């Protein structure tokens, strides 16, 4: 084995020279230079400074403007709530531990940080699944004239939390475990060992199949069908130009969210899968640190995409920030094509 395994940690560094210490007790400066830990802390500070205001603003603007409280926006707000969980439950902890060079909060703190990071990522993934299904059902109409209403949105939000908890909670109760990863300043699922005492192998397989592969299959199926249907509807001119434009804009926004999710999380998932399938292989702490910390940037991109691509929300946000007056002078009529409401695009 090219790493050192302890009772509640795995350090990707051989202890032949006897320098390895528990990441809960002493700085891990034998893994990387102190300035590299400082860079991680600076990065986490940046994510907190950007992530909290933009996600809080998303929630606040929606509460302030009744016109934004549409069923589809419930799912988008769910993403903002998940991102805030990551900011407060994960990023603040990782900032502090990076400044100290090791996970100063011990195994209990590691469990909490790993839980919130996993929970936030899984809520985001399952929210994208719900959005994909909503777009598919509304645009492709496999169930005739289905209308995505408030009750459906609430059920979708509840579903995302149930599925996210089904992934994030088991390591807290004995099925797998959370341990420090990479440079040992943040925690995640144990992909490094089989750890039969906590049935780690079965959990990792369960996680990759149920909480990554299946959601990706559903998302790609829905959008594959959706793109075909929208093209057919446009070719046959079955709906007005305004309706088609509205549907294209909403669909484009959600697809971009999926693309950015993959950009942020696919490197982490790929590295984790490689480590799990190559037990004991030689890899450095940076190998897992970079994708793990890059994945944390997902807390920023969803609200940014929403603000940039949804004109109605952007106008409401500017009105809120400018004390009731939109400096651009855009009214609601100009934002009609960007409203995230139910679709009227007919099937092909």
Curated annotation (Swiss-Prot):
Modified residues (Phosphoserine): 334, 338, 343
Segment forming the signal sequence: none
Gene Ontology molecular function terms on file: 11-cis retinal binding; G protein-coupled photoreceptor activity; metal ion binding; spectrin binding
Annotated motif 'Ionic lock' involved in activated form stabilization, positions: 134-136
Key words, A-Z: Acetylation, Cell projection, Chromophore, Disulfide bond, G-protein coupled receptor, Glycoprotein, Lipoprotein, Membrane, Metal-binding, Palmitate, Phosphoprotein, Photoreceptor protein, Receptor, Retinal protein, Sensory transduction, Transducer, Transmembrane, Transmembrane helix, Vision, Zinc
Any single biological process term in GO: detection of temperature stimulus involved in thermoception
Bridged cysteine pairs (disulfide): 110-187
Matches recorded under Pfam families: 7tm_1 (PF00001), Rhodopsin_N (PF10413)
Region (Interaction with SAG): 330-348
Subcellular localization: Membrane; Cell projection, Cilium, Photoreceptor outer segment
Membrane-spanning ranges: 37-61, 74-96, 111-133, 153-173, 203-224, 253-274, 287-308
Gene3D superfamilies in the record: Rhodopsin 7-helix transmembrane proteins (1.20.1070.10)
Stated role: Photoreceptor required for image-forming vision at low light intensity. Required for photoreceptor cell viability after birth. Light-induced isomerization of 11-cis to all-trans retinal triggers a conformational change that activates signaling via G-proteins. Subsequent receptor phosphorylation mediates displacement of the bound G-protein alpha subunit by the arrestin SAG and terminates signaling.
Subunit structure: Homodimer. May form a complex composed of RHO, GRK1 and RCVRN in a Ca(2+)-dependent manner; RCVRN prevents the interaction between GRK1 and RHO. Interacts with GRK1. Interacts (phosphorylated form) with SAG. Interacts with GNAT1. Interacts with GNAT3. SAG and G-proteins compete for a common binding site. Interacts with PRCD; the interaction promotes PRCD stability. Forms a complex with ASAP1 and ARF4. Forms a complex with ASAP1, RAB11A, Rabin8/RAB3IP, ARF4 and RAB11FIP3; the complex regulates Golgi-to-cilia rhodopsin/RHO transport in photoreceptors.
Sequence similarity: Belongs to the G-protein coupled receptor 1 family. Opsin subfamily.
Protein name: Rhodopsin
Annotated source species: Mus musculus (Mouse)
């Amino acid at each position: 084995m090219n790493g050192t395994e302890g009772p509640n940690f795995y350090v990707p560094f051989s202890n032949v020279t006897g320098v390895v210490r528990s990441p809960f007790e002493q700085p891990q400066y034998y893994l990387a230079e102190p300035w590299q830990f400082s860079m991680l802390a600076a990065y986490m500070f940046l994510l907190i400074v950007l992530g909290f205001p933009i996600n809080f603003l998303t929630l606040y603007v929606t509460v302030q403007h009744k016109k934004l409280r549409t069923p589809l926006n419930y799912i988008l707000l769910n993403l903002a709530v998940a991102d805030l969980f990551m900011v407060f439950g994960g990023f603040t902890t990782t900032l502090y531990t990076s400044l100290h060079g090791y996970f100063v909060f011990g195994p209990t703190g590691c469990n909490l940080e790993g839980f919130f990071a996993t929970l936030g990522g899984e809520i985001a993934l399952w929210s994208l699944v719900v959005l994909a299904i909503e777009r598919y059902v509304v645009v492709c109409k496999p169930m005739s004239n289905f209308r995505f209403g408030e009750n459906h949105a609430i059920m979708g939000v509840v579903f995302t939390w149930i599925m996210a908890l089904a992934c994030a909670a088991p390591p807290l109760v004995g099925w797998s475990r959370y341990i420090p990863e990479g440079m040992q300043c943040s925690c995640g699922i144990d992909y490094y060992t089989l750890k039969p005492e906590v049935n780690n192998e079965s959990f990792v397989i369960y996680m990759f199949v149920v909480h990554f592969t299946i959601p990706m299959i559903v998302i790609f199926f829905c959008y594959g069908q959706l793109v075909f249907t929208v093209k057919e509807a446009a070719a046959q001119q079955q709906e007005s130009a305004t309706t088609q434009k509205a549907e294209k804009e909403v669909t484009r926004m959600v697809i971009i969210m999926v693309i950015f999710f993959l950009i942020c999380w696919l490197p982490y998932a790929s590295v984790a899968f490689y480590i799990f399938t190559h037990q004991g292989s030689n890899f450095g702490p940076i190998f897992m640190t970079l994708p793990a910390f890059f994945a944390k940037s997902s807390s920023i991109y969803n609200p940014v995409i929403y603000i940039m691509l949804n004109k109605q929300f952007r106008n409401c946000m500017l009105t809120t920030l400018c004390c009731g007056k939109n400096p651009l002078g855009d009214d609601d009529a100009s934002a009609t094509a960007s409203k995230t409401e139910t679709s009227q695009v007919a099937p092909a």
